[in-house]
A protein has these predicted regions:
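E2/UBC-UEV (E2-variant) core
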Residues: 60-84
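Short Cys/His-rich zinc-binding micro-motifs
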Residues: 3-14
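Cysteine-centered loop/knuckle micro-motif
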Residues: 16-20
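Short, charged/polar surface micro-motifs in flexible loops or helix N-caps
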Residues: 35-36, 48-51, 213-217
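Short beta-strand scaffold segments in enzyme catalytic cores
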Residues: 26-30
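Unchanged
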Residues: 59, 72-75, 92, 96-265, ...
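Entry beta-strands of beta-propeller and related beta-repeat scaffolds
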Residues: 40-41
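Short, solvent-exposed beta-strand-terminating loops
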Residues: 45-62
Length: 274
């Protein structure tokens, strides 16, 4: 009998849904030090905000969970707020997944319930003596994010993939930068980002450090399905640009980015000598 294998932590003896570890992702912080006093790293802007995806998938349990729905809506970009008001659910679902025929079966099963909940909110409902609809809920959120979340390239492991293999593959999928374009710094312990999301799920992101061999152009490749279905834009950012672009509630993300820059500024010459 084949031993149970967990595709989250990579250990045997249990399966993914019984794993006690946080949801694990692996990525690479790739830096360019060709201008020593202006070191930059690769950052990506998500195609869709996390909260936007959660809302369309109906992850608020009930349309009467007003506070949580408003929290999700408050983290939409300006474009996402306009999009969700202007389109019906089927169009939004198609835009979200793009290739709907290849959606994970588990996500595909969410479609009917998600659509019903969305339409109930959009059409309007009464709760505790007050009327709500999607337009009014959005109008009660005053955030004006001009972009979606910026973050470090990362992702979850494939079956039987080790941590480093996962990081290299996910980084290439999201950036189009292959492992031949950079050196992984093997004598540096990966940086860890760990937090609990607003959905009360624990996450842990493990980032290896890579140094680009020579500056390379960053762009969205429309031939790379793994990239254009998840990434809206990609850029080289210095420390100040990272802190400006990362949203204020993502303090855990800012922390790991600043830890990286502080470490590199102190140790980059030693790294280059090894």
């Amino acid at each position: 009998m084949e031993r149970k294998y967990c595709n989250n932590c990579g250990n045997f003896g249990h399966i993914y849904k019984h794993c006690r570890h946080p949801i694990l992702s692996y990525g690479i912080i790739l830096y360019d030090d060709s201008i020593p006093d202006n070191i930059k790293i690769v950052m990506i802007e998500r195609k869709d905000s996390i909260s936007y995806i959660e809302f369309l998938r109906g992850k608020y349990k009930s349309h009467t969970n007003i506070d949580y729905i408003k929290l999700l809506l408050s983290r939409f970009s300006v474009d996402e707020k306009q999009r969700i008001i202007s389109n019906d659910f089927d169009e939004l679902w198609k835009q979200l997944w793009i290739h709907t025929e290849t959606i994970n079966p588990r996500v595909k099963r969410e479609y009917t319930i998600s659509k019903r909940n969305f339409n109930r909110i959009k059409d309007g409902f009464e709760y505790e003596g007050k009327s709500y609809n999607l337009q009014s809920l959005i109008e009660e959120t005053d955030t004006l994010y001009e972009s979606n979340e910026w973050e470090l390239p990362k992702g979850r492991r494939n079956l039987r993939e080790n941590n480093r293999e996962c990081a290299i593959r996910e980084f290439q999928e999201e950036t189009n930068i292959t492992h031949t374009n950079y050196d992984l710094i093997t004598n540096i312990v990966p940086l860890i980002e760990e937090y609990t999301g607003i959905n009360n799920v624990r996450y842990k992101h493990v980032y290896y450090i890579g140094r680009v061999k020579e500056p390379c152009e960053l762009k969205i490749n429309m031939m790379n399905k793994d990239q254009y279905t998840e990434v809206k834009s990609i850029s080289w950012f210095n420390q100040e640009e990272c802190n400006t672009s990362i949203r204020e509630y993502d303090s855990h993300k800012k922390k790991v980015v600043n830890e990286f820059f502080d470490f590199i500024k102190m140790n980059n010459q030693l790294i280059q000598m090894k």
